[in-house]
From Swiss-Prot:
One of its GO terms (cellular component) is Golgi cisterna membrane. Belongs to the glycosyltransferase 11 family. It is found in: Golgi apparatus, Golgi stack membrane. It comes from the Eukaryota. Glycans are attached at residues 195, 289, 315. This is Galactoside 2-alpha-L-fucosyltransferase Sec1. The keyword Membrane applies. The lineage of its organism: Eukaryota, Metazoa, Chordata, Craniata, Vertebrata. The gene is Sec1.
Amino acid sequence: MPSDSCLLSLTVLQRLRAICPPLSTFYLFFVIFVVSTIFHCHRRLGLVPAPWASPSLVVFPPRHMPREGMFTIRVKGRLGNQMGEYATLFALARMNGRLAFIPASMHSTLAPIFRISLPVLHSDTAKRIPWQNYHLNDWMEERYRHIPGHYVRFTGYPCSWTFYHHLRPEILKEFTLHDHVREEAQAFLRGLQVNGSQPSTFVGVHVRRGDYVRVMPKVWKGVVADRGYLEKALDRFRARYSSPVFVVTSDDMAWCRKSITASRGDVAFAGNGLQGSPAKDIALLMQCNHTVITLGTFGIWAAYLTGGDTVYLANFTQPNSPFHTVFKPEAAYLPEWVGIAADLGQPNTVGSGHASARAPKRHWGALL
């Protein structure tokens, strides 16, 4: 016969079973909690599916937009343009006390190459925001220090050091190459020799041609870099440094091989000469000590990030060129850079060609 203590224990157990839910109920509540948490997190944060994507795609619920406002920028152009747009957004947001967010397409272009840090704005969120479009010229103006509006989207092709040079250390950090990109470029440079010896001075050379060959003479009344300019630029470095090697990148490598004298053994033609490999080209240029550039924002950025001495093509348009309304040389090239004047009389250039004379709808930056 059970003792009184056993009977008491059985009675307590029966009462607990009566008032406590079964274990399966606890499992059900736990599953609901986990699913709910995942659902709400998924709505707020969508991670970019890439190994370089440290920022998240930011999704703000409609009633939780940043009260201090936010800046973004409309993406236009290729790599050089987007680097200029990113740096300008970075600087103007800091200057105006706003949060800065980049479009997902800009992240897809820059993040595989550089260690950028600005967060990405989800496209679904961007569509719900009442943006105020704000056009930027390609140079800093005083009014840009006090930009009105809470939700501002910049337009234009800004790529001028006048926007962001006061933040140069931070800009250099934003455009730090990923290790694997940098190491691939360095491996190429280590394999170069000048007359059988390892060079100590590397000069990156970027030759921009492409559609500029026809657009410059017909639309902008200007020229592209010719053989004479490149000879002068390279000779300047040969006179200043002992046994330099020139690392040539271009979107028209066939023209470079015909036009740049390589008989001295100090010229290396790098890359495949296609516009589809900008990451490799800019990485090579950035690992050099000095830079020679022709036209385009790509070359300007390569020189800016490299440091060292820079030689650029100057005075490449006629005095009455409409190019002067959208481009200021003093805002594009750092004061310490050295310009070599273009030959405006080179044959089959100014006023020739087969392109339509009608001015394009795009800003010149779209061609760079």
